[in-house]
Amino acid sequence: AVAVDGRPADLPSALAVPADADRETAAQRRVADWFFAVLVGAQVLLAVAVLPLLRRARRHAGPVGPAPVPRRVVATVELLLIAAALAVPAALLADVVPWWRGDHAGAWFAVVTLLLVAGGTAAVRFAPGHAATLGPLGAVAGLATLVVGADVLTGARLQLNGVVGYSALEGGRFAGLGTVGLGVFVAGSLLCAGWLAQRVPRGWRPVVVVAVGGIAVVVVGSPYLGADSTGAIALTAGVSVAAAISTGGWLTVSRLVWAAMAGLAATVGFAVVDLRRPPAERGSLGRFLAALGDGTGGLTVHRASGANFQTLVDSPLTVLALAAALLVWFALLQPWGGLKRLFGIYPAMRAAMAGTAVAAVLAGLLGGSALDVAGAAGALVVPMAALAALRVLDHSTDRTRPDDGGPANGRLLAAPRRPADDELPAGPGAGDGTADGGTAHDGAATPGSTPDPAARASTGAATT
């Protein structure tokens, strides 16, 4: 026998490696079912618990109004939302520890995952900028992108036979980004792009989104990294939409044309690269184009349609995607939900979330995984959207004191207090809420009067 570099020199050690992989694969199949069931149940229960908080999150400036939610309750719910968003990245990172070698593999996986979730939540909670409205969102998106991106850059070892990865026994994929990893990476990278774009001047926001999104597209589509050309095309479409509306406004015809041109250019580029590879190494896009060339493209479309339908019916991530869509449409996007206010104040975040929705849905349909990619992305995006909406509503009655005749400088003021009758000065207007000179005590001015500079308070939301 001849020893080969990089391989075990003795036979028992060589046999231990595939045996350990078999144990991991068997444990992964058992644990994955209940993990996703618990994830879906926890996210749905958390969504139901958030609804009454959204209703009462807006603090009323006047003397009459519903009692606000106690700060401790809000802080606890925020921590639960952060933990829910970090559940999938923590489950991916749990494979660093060989939990499958124990007698109770499922229990060990649960313990390791919960410890990682707790550590990630604590890191987000005590990170600088946590008090800002978008602070937790940016931190969670950064952690999720870092975990999945680092795994892809190091060979995707955590996703192979991982609970939130893919199984070698199924034979669908042996390297690169899996379905769940793609959803988390798409959502995390676009949220990071939106968070960074919101911190730069308006004219530079599309540049930031394209720069961050372009790096993510390369990671997803490179045959040596993510090896998912259809996912890269979907992500390109999402980045194009996000960049087009990152400065505010709607997706006009001209913006849509530019976004479509960018997506078409990326599609052609990945198609050329994939077709130049050997037939055995081509991705789904290259195989589909080759099938079109020899007249068997219809069979490929039929197989993809069947895979989409089967996944749509069987996968628990379908339930998670539908629950996330219902929460967004019937709660967060309502006038009391706070998401419209968030989008108005932070247009780059609206662009990032719109791009995430486009990319996740397209990636699932093109890749034959139906709503699985959207469900994985929603597990990260929706809890963070709910948290940001809660914070925006909580700041809805904040005031900013402007400089003398100048724009608001961001200092917060409490809501103006109406003085008691015995505090009102004598003279004209006494007792009716106005003082001498015609200036109202609530900051409004009567006709013909000049309000005091300190009373000209802006009603805009506090900025981060």
Explain the meaning of each model-derived region:
Residues 253-261, 270, 282, 286-417, ...:
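Long, compositionally biased intrinsically disordered regions
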Residues 19-165, 180-193:
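Core alpha-helical transmembrane segments of integral membrane proteins
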Residues 129-139, 202-207, 248-261:
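Membrane-interfacial entry segments at the cytosolic side of transmembrane helices
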Residues 135-152, 157, 257-294:
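Aromatic-rich transmembrane-lumenal/periplasmic boundary elements in polytopic membrane proteins
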Residues 97-103, 220-229, 365-372:
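Membrane-interface helix caps and helix-loop-helix hairpins in membrane proteins
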Residues 42-50, 110-128, 176-196, 234-248, ...:
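Hydrophobic cores of alpha-helical transmembrane segments in multi-pass inner/ER membrane proteins
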Residues 1-30:
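Soluble extramembrane regions of membrane proteins in the secretory/endomembrane system
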Residues 26-34, 165-185, 224, 289-319:
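Short aromatic-rich membrane-water interface segments that cap or initiate transmembrane helices
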